[in-house]
Amino acid sequence: MEKLTVLILVAIVLLTIQVLGQSDRDKHPKRRPRQYATKRLSALMKGHRQCTGAGFECEETPECCPNLTCKCSGSPLCTRYRCKT
């Protein structure tokens, strides 16, 4: 029973230290711009991944990545379109 009480007290102390440490970090104004910059970078990277890259099949130009257009590749019958520069 004593071991359980000690373990509970240690857990409470550790949680208190963690909560105090997190609230102290939120007060630093320099950390927030980094956080927003990270989110913006992440959004840009996700947006970049959603486009179709060079050499991959496409149906319309807007789905291709920037500076690429959906062009016919190969035979004169034009059965395959791919994103090209």
From Swiss-Prot:
Tissue expression: Expressed by the venom duct.
List of residues that carry Pyrrolidone carboxylic acid: 50
Keyword Secreted: yes
Alphabetical UniProt keywords: Disulfide bond, Pyrrolidone carboxylic acid, Secreted, Signal, Toxin
A Pfam family matched in the record: Conotoxin
GO CC annotation, single: extracellular region
Family: Belongs to the conotoxin O2 superfamily.
Domain notes: The cysteine framework is XV (C-C-CC-C-C-C-C).
Annotated protein name in UniProt: Conotoxin Mi15b
Organism encoding this protein: Conus miles
